[in-house]
Each structure stands twice: as C-alpha cells, then as structure tokens.
Amino acid sequence: MEFGKIIISETAANSENPQDVVNSNISVINLMREEKIDDDLIHEDALMSYYLDFYASKYAEGNFSKFVHDSGWNKELNELIEEGLALIGAEKHLELFKEQSRKLRLQSNIKLGKFLKDKYDAPNAFKDLLNNNAYFELDENLVELNAAFLKSHPDTEVLSVDEMFKTLEEFVGHEIKRD
C-alpha cells in the first residue's frame, strides 16, 4: 500500500525559510527509508521534491559535474528531475538541465565512465567541460519553487512532530524510535 501523503512539519510550514519546508520533506523520506519503506511506496511527488533538492545541492556544491559524478548519471533520476523541474514551474532550470544533458550525451561513454570512477576532486578536463555557471544566474529560485510546490500540493499534510510520527507509525505498523 502506497503512503499517499506528503508530510511537512508545522514548524517548517510556518518558517520564513523555504529550505525548511524542503528539509522537512527530506527528513520524512529519510525516516521512511530508515524504516525500510521502499521508494515505490513513498509519494512520488515527495520523492521528486527530494531529488530536486539533491540536484540543486550538488550543483551549488560543485556545479553540474558534481551532480553527474555523485548521481552516477542515472537515467531514471534524470527523468525524474526533468519532470520535477517542469512540475514546479522551473522552466529556465529545465531548459538548462536539458542543455547540459545534451552536452553530456555528445561525450564518449568511456570518458563518462572514467569520470564517474575517479575521485571527484582530481583534476579532470571532462569535469570542466560539464560545468556551466548559467545555473547561478537564472532568476528562478529552485528552493522557493520546490517549497511552494510542497506547501500547495493537494496531498500535503502539515502536522506537529508528534502527529508526523503517529502517522508514520500507523503506516509501518510499529513504534518508530525517536532520536
């Protein structure tokens, strides 16, 4: 049975910082994974938001090459990110992602494979080729768009931390240890 909800905490929902909303969703997904809940059972839009944050975080950490390296350039993940960017209305980010993906597809699979196997911090012309600072100049804020998407989603429930645990415990069928 799929968990048909996106859960964010009251604290996050009331925060002025949109990253708090995104982080709340991430925390719920991480907790569900710790409880061995398969991704297929987690709300697909909650997961999409999770992976959009992964993309944005990796880009901010080390540009497009960092995302490619740390994701292993996973086709399924890339499709999810494309769908997610479109869904939250990040049209400029979507166009850049598609452009970067095309650039990568034109490269040799051997070069990509070597890049993915090497340590990221090693000097690498392939890494430099992948980077594109246009991301940082776009006037679309992915965190704000992602948070607004989560807050306005029809399946989103804003709950206290106790209510969050109770809801998840009902789904998994046992008490969840709180740290």
Spell out what each predicted region is:
Residues 2-59, 69-77, 84-179:
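Extended, alpha-helix-rich binding/interface surfaces that flank or overlap catalytic cores
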Residues 60-64:
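Boundary/linker elements of alpha-helical solenoid repeat scaffolds
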